Amino acid sequence: MKSPLRLSAFAGTIILCIALVAQPLCAQTSNAPEREQLLNGLRLLFFPKPGDPEVVLKLRINSGAAFDLAGKSGEMALLGDLLFPDPATLDYFTDEMGGRLDVAVTYDSTTITMVGKADQFEHIVEVLRNGLISTELTPEMVTKIRDARIKLLRDTKISPTEVADRAIAARLYGDFPYGRPAAGSPEDVARVDRADLMQAHDRFLNSNNATLAIIGGVTKQRAMRTLRQLLGPWRKSEEIVPTTFRQPNPPDTRTLIVNVPGPTVELRLAARGVSRADTDYPISMVLARVAQHRWEAASPELSKQPVFARSDAYVLPGAFVMGAAVTDMTVADSLAKAKKVIDSLMTTPATAAELDRAKNELSAELSAVLTKPDAAADPWLDADTYRLTAPQDQIALLKSVNASDIQRVANRLFNKTVVSVVAGESAPLKAALQGHYQYEVLGEIATPAPSQKPPTKPANNNNPR
């Protein structure tokens, strides 16, 4: 018969093992929110922090600038401006509560972030309610806010970097929504009228097209009572407008020259990429970082200049973009080396050192973003926006990428058309590219080649004298 002491020790060991196994599970699920849904379809995520004096409200509306009408880019951004048009409202959040209120419009979504004091929760929700349900779309207010956005766009100096980024997007996508700036242009915003904004408000700003996250020192019971009362009346849409558009036409393969005065030249290359929900998205991120490192190694002069490669992913397939600041003397060589890097990614597997460096850099950057107080809800909000089956552990997905994944995705992306743009002074750029690459100058009508006409024969004069 076993002694009680030995049985007690054995039981203690079992309990300890269970505790050790359960610990990572608890750590993984402790950050998961409590979920609720109002009768109008508004999805709720609760991240309680008992005793925290602050509260963060993050409302994600799953429609963005991709739905701007043709020739009216900036329409959804302008609608975002109209949600909280009174400067006193913004001052209240910054001055009175030491927080902030902002509206961010991307191609895929409109996100309202409100940071304030937990004891002012009811008032914060009331401000949100007024912006969503009682949006002031009077002719006078629309004119005032539209003029303010146009002035902001005109007064904001567009750097050569932004010119190149916009040009490569337009070159790759043409008239497709991702080819125009989400913030709009002065000319396009001026075309947006009140009827456009009212229609966009009715189509997209609906309760069942949104998810609200509450993070901080507010109990779920208190929050539910307030949300039912103030956001319960928010109108539900009969049908969610799907993100479907006619596919863009094949892009022009000639290098586009954009005339921009300045001492440097901005070089861009791009290919059609993957969507945010694509299982290859994390692989494309690592692929981009490996591409950047190979380009830097092939062109030592880039080490002292801004250089990047990135995978831009949206609800629909985005773009794989490489870019650097070069000179008109080195632009042809830099373009050639970038193309060689693209070829090498399809034929030469990434080394273990390349993979480790890329994954470590990306993981560190992502960790820095996710540790911000108002970023706790982002994986769950993204899951709704991009129709993911579950919130993604992006760091774990990055770390699982291997060399064969990189080569497979490189062949998937780069077997399609790769486009290029150079932004700088056009005269030296034309001289630099002449004889190396076919090019087109933006806004310049190509001079037609002279026609080869046979020489005119002299008339035969048979008139008698």
Spell out what each predicted region is.
Residues 95-200, 246, 340, 355-374:
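Acidic/histidine-enriched segments that form metal/cofactor-coordinating
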Residues 28, 211-216, 248, 357-465:
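C-terminal regions of mature proteins
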Residues 11-23:
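Bacterial N-terminal signal peptides
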Residues 148-167, 246-264, 301-302, 348-399:
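Short acidic/His-enriched helical or mixed secondary-structure segments at domain edges of catalytic enzymes
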Residues 1-14:
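Bacterial N-terminal signal peptides that target proteins for export
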Residues 85-86, 115-147, 311-369, 445-450, ...:
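M16/insulysin-pitrilysin zinc metalloprotease superfamily fold
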